[in-house]
Amino acid sequence: MPHSYGYRARTRALFARAFKTNGPVHLSTYLTNFKIGEYVDVVGNAAVHKGMPFKYYHGRTGIVWNVTKRAIGVEINKRVRHRIIKKRIHVRIDHVKKSSCRDSFLKRVKENDKIKHDAHVAKLPVPSTKRLPVLPKAGAIIKSKGQVPETCHAIPYEHLV
């Protein structure tokens, strides 16, 4: 059993920085703009102790609900027994990065809008933009070029003892 149950207990590997990424924080971290409603990833940066999130929130994705001078408010879903609670925390900008969780969705929306616009311009009916599961492969005819196909059967089981 561990001796202490402190705020940062057992976070040696959790907050450890990756190989060759030690040292001061890059300026681009502070120049990033965050808007209310954006998705962000909470990732604790061990180089900056101020405004560091509690270890539970490390690696979680949330939505920005408040922006201040040096920190942003992030709303994160936390499962407590049988229910999910929305937790609102303030985290310094050093410990937050923009999430790429919606990139594929936004790309798909853009492509669908383009398809609909092109159909409208060409005065064609709007095609369905729903994603469909992959269908089974179509049947094919195999040519044997004069060779007779051989029928395979399972070998009957024989008791060898």
UniProtKB/Swiss-Prot annotation:
UniProt-listed InterPro entries: Ribosomal_eL21, Ribosomal_eL21_CS, Ribosomal_eL21_sf, Translation_prot_SH3-like_sf
UniProt keywords, alphabetically: Ribonucleoprotein, Ribosomal protein
Pfam family, one: Ribosomal_L21e
GO cellular component, one term: ribonucleoprotein complex
Domain of life per record: Eukaryota
GO biological process terms on file: translation
GO molecular function: structural constituent of ribosome
Family: Belongs to the eukaryotic ribosomal protein eL21 family.
Entry protein name: Large ribosomal subunit protein eL21
Native species: Cyanophora paradoxa
